[in-house]
């Protein structure tokens, strides 16, 4: 199905005419050569009548049209599909050409970038990669001459004589190998991709088990996503990898290929069924096992890694102890045993039992590097009944490790003792609870949320630091933690790790070479916090019982139900053991390991701060906030929780009688290592006072008695109102006090349930608008005195010329150059008072020494006296002024002599008698909304009157024959 792409179309089309001409010439020459052969043949008419002639079709000009060549890398030969990506081509092949999927699907070569079907790939590997992998050393030819090639140890031809080569597929993650490609692939599905298939694994119900479906599917499993029913667990894993996860290329990359040299006479006794007597050595000791070269080159990815061993005697084969996993499968599946043995030419080994064949326990290991995990093996037919029985009866084969110093292969159980005894290694324990071990070659860092290979894991852990298991000190160098362990904890053994720790064999160069075995304890998902607490309590109890001095233990009754549960759990940890498995978080899609019933609940509470519940209206499974107990909708996501926590009012509140929620590093799990809100320490008295006053100080404002904060307006009662009302209060506060201190901003934010940044930005924006208005609109600064009171002053006064304004007639009067919202009625005066005629107070004498002289036609108004005396105003009506004269708006007059002072003596003549009485008028306030005459009036009313303004009417006076006045309030 794979077709090579066509490139360089321009060059091809240029040469097409030439190629056609050449082909036509070649065809014409061919016809001329053979035309002479057919001249002698003269068929009869009967022969012509018996023949059938086909009509030639007419020439179609559309055939000469240039075709659309596919320049992409992966092209389908059965249809016009082409793609740059192998995954898209594979999906197309699976969906469109499903019937040819298994036989003609492309597979990636594990040695190079070649892709082809199964048969073509095997031919490609045999032709191009097989000679490069056959590395021999010390192999002697039939006549005793060493066999070699120009490059040293490469053999380009198969060995002659009594030896032959067998192709073997092996797993790059472990030591498993077999001659069949599918067997190795099923092994990878079963052993290395269980974590991928677990979220999709579902068990059939009791009805399906009792029905006829159970006969076809004896395993009783199905896919949760598409309800696919496989025949085996490996088929389910393959289904998940190929159809749901689309990571089949990873399985192909994990399968390696190599060749094994096998003697031809090895398989004859076993194929004929001749029993092998235990304890008797064969007569041909060098012909009854697989001889492997000393230099083995195994590909890892697209590179070749070769492990060079020490010197050995030429011509002597090397014997290798093969792991049980490579030859004898587990007791659950006996069918694979014959395949594993038959993969090396031992086809009749399926009937071997524990009394007829065994593996030799005295074989030496093949020296290999620690990075090479596929060890070549030597099968021997020797005795050791016990070893054979143990190898065949074990339900799970053990893992093997290669010593990095002596390059020998050992079981995992005996490797630690070998390294400590033979190489005088010092054991140093450390902790890295932020590392979660996935399998032997991959781990996950919970801090960085990334997967790390085994070769770079130690360097990454040193970046975060390794902790001492005794004193929990953190070190970023191996030498320092080794020195710390020798000095501070020389005789302390420490707690034994519950799981399999990460082992690093190191050689430190501190003066003399020193071998160190670093044992790093990682996070164990199978160990729950309750089980860890119970184990720690049991360990402490055992240590106390070992002490010679008796320990007096006081027993008390549990106060609450939780204490009783904790005590019962510590007393019977076995009964509280829960089923351990894997589950998937529906919010962040994190794979959770641990007790199935508690892992998801702990993760949702610690990471997302929610609890599972049932929606009261929708009747669907949803979540509720652990702070305010608000219920989310059923279509919520993780971002919805984040937005809610920003505005949640119950985050900083702690209900009475309950413990505060700690969202720190409660456990070393993956969910608890994410960033969360930090709860304040309840032991702090200031913070405890803040929690008690959380109704008015929700953002954490604490009062300081030595620094009291007095606000210009009282914000009490505005915290529960709408956002617009709270913003309006801030605007009114700005009009009273535009430059608040930092403590005032904090108190306002805490009282109004606003962020401090919002309050500060609100004041800053209004200040910036005021500065812009001063620059662009050029407003007038009002004087701070009452003009009506000023008109009664009896001494001379001098004003700047900029303080005067000119009064026009009614029909010529206009508005000042200020904003329209300021040109309203005066502040603090009712409409009836403004529109009515007000008499002018003239005092007791008819001729007073007044500083101003009123002009005819000007309206006189009463003036509020700001004095401590209780004197009252006597208002005398002016007969020369009409009662309905409208108040004119002032207009600014530009003075021609700027900077000069205008000093005029204005005389105010009054033609009314002093003995005339006038009604008493009380003092008026300028701004009733912000008046501070009484404590009750100091609070802001909350609204602005439509009649409020910043201008008040001023009296009109005559200066040098002109009608002038003063701006004032």
From Swiss-Prot:
A Pfam family annotated for this UniProt entry: Homeodomain
Chain intervals with Polar residues compositional bias: 929-946
Gene disruption: observed consequences: Knockout is viable, without apparent morphological defects, but, in an adnpb mutant background, some embryos have axis formation defects and at 36-48 hours post-fertilization (hpf), have abnormal body morphology with significant brain neuron death. Expression of neural genes such as dlx5a, neurod1, and phox2a is greatly reduced in day 2 embryos in an adnpb mutant background. Beta-catenin ctnnb1 levels reduced in an adnpb mutant background. Morpholino knockdown reduces numbers of blood cells in circulation from 28 hours hpf. Significant reduction in hemoglobin content at 48 and 72 hpf.
Swiss-Prot/TrEMBL keywords: DNA-binding, Homeobox, Metal-binding, Nucleus, Repeat, Transcription, Transcription regulation, Zinc, Zinc-finger
Main location as per UniProt: nucleus
Domain of life of the source: Eukaryota
GO BP terms, alphabetized: erythrocyte maturation; regulation of gene expression; regulation of neurogenesis; Wnt signaling pathway
Annotated localization: Nucleus
GO molecular function terms attached to this record: beta-catenin binding; DNA binding; zinc ion binding
Gene3D superfamilies, per the entry: Classic Zinc Finger, Homeodomain-like
Protein name: Activity-dependent neuroprotective protein a
Protein's organism: Danio rerio (Zebrafish)
